[in-house]
Amino acid sequence: MILHFIESPVYSQQIDDLLSPEDHRQLQLYLFQFPDQGDLIKGSGGLRKLRWAGSGRGKRGGIRVIYYLWHGDTAFMLTAYPKNEQTDLTPAQTRALKQLIEKYTTER
């Protein structure tokens, strides 16, 4: 199986601040092996939230990665944030990301 990663500009900037390049590769490898491991976000149209350990952040310094798995072979990496700054997406954030995915996937 091949899994393609498409990163939003926001995600690319956030993940660079949160993970080392090696830790980011480990995250991608994990998603390659287990693409549906993130918890489904209720009412999001299929968005997933993956809990991941942050680089040098210790046991409690995890991050959250929000992504959308499309057709089982494409992962849209949308946003990432430290757990200690935000635990869940707000309803407005969830709606905005859902609309973004709906727009993108219907144009393809």
Model feature map: region roles:
Residues M1-E22:
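Arg/Lys-rich, positively charged N-terminal/basic patches that mediate binding to nucleic acids
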Residues L19-G38:
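Compact soluble domain cores
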Residues Q37, I41-Y81, E85:
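Basic/aromatic recognition patch in beta-strand/loop cores that engages polyanionic ligands
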